[in-house]
Swiss-Prot record:
It comes from Bacillus subtilis (strain 168). The gene is yosD. Residues 102-131 are annotated as: Disordered. This is SPbeta prophage-derived uncharacterized protein YosD. Residues 111-125 have a biased composition (Polar residues).
Length: 131
């Protein structure tokens, strides 16, 4: 096939956060969750090779590295679009990160006050206390 027009696209990720209790402890931790939102072009132009197979590696001069092709499409004008596994940009959701930090701080304060209450009462009172 020879020379053809190609567009190589990379992934744009969105990172959200949620908080949960660490297993077996009283600590609350913030956990990121990444999700692919869209693709954006890394390279657009003509290439002088045969169409790239899925799973094949392609060198991109602008990035100075090889990327792996995960999907490809061709239109009627012999223009190919290749999707890759390369993450171009990560968008961090500041609102969810702030909410998680506030939630973790609130839970930490609650645990501290609970621990202080337990320290103030004697072990005998806690043992004989009827719940």
């Amino acid at each position: 096939m020879g020379r053809h027009k190609a567009t190589i696209e990379g992934l744009v990720m969105k990172e959200r956060y949620y908080s949960h209790r660490a297993p077996g402890t009283e600590r609350w931790i913030t956990q990121p969750v990444c999700k692919v939102t869209r693709t954006e072009p890394i390279f657009e132009g003509y290439i002088d090779i045969e169409p790239i197979e899925i799973g094949g590696k392609v060198y991109i001069p602008g990035l100075n590295e090889y990327v792996i092709v995960t999907d490809r499409q061709r239109n009627i004008h012999n223009e190919w679009t290749y999707q890759t596994d390369r993450v171009i940009k990560t968008i961090i959701d500041e609102k969810s990160l702030k909410e998680c930090e506030e939630h973790n701080n609130k839970k930490a304060k609650n645990n501290d006050t609970q621990n202080q209450r337990q320290i103030k009462t004697s072990w005998w009172q806690r043992l004989t206390k009827k719940d």
